[in-house]
């Protein structure tokens, strides 16, 4: 049996593992965000599917040689990971400071190591180097997707 030591000492909340009072404002904010998602899930999913469709169409009509990493259907609707042949993702980002992209998974954002997820998929190093994640938000527009494709084409 392993005994866990408290992160902080104090009032004994969280079974004596982490003392401290939760922020009421943050708790209310989380509740409102959950309510918003519950109330608007279909609307948001439709929006993300439209954005993904626009992105795929614009990629197909571009001069870019690209490949989608992972299954196109079995993924969350607002997320796509692609590799562009002959490009290094980190170098692309230097020319597009106005566009937020990531070459790692969301949980390793900011690290300089290659993606453990793409490595586990047995992708070659060149493909991993050219891979990046595109995540859309509720306010992402089709015009922003077109701007992304233009930037990737160095236009």
Predicted regions and their residues:
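Pyridoxal 5′-phosphate
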Residues: 1-155
């Amino acid at each position: 049996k392993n005994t866990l030591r408290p992160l902080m000492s104090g009032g004994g909340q969280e079974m004596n593992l982490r003392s401290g009072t939760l922020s009421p404002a943050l708790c209310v904010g989380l509740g409102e965000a959950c309510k918003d998602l519950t109330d608007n899930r279909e609307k948001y999913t439709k929006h993300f599917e439209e954005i993904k469709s626009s992105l795929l169409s614009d990629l197909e009509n571009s001069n870019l040689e690209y490949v989608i990493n992972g299954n196109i259907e079995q993924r969350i609707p607002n997320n796509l990971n692609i590799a562009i042949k002959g490009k290094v993702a980190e170098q692309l980002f230097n020319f597009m400071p106005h566009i937020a992209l990531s070459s790692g998974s969301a949980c390793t954002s900011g690290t300089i190591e290659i993606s453990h997820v793409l490595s586990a998929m047995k992708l070659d190093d060149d493909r991993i180097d050219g891979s990046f994640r595109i995540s859309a938000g509720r306010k992402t527009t089709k015009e922003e997707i077109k701007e992304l494709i233009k930037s990737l084409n160095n236009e």
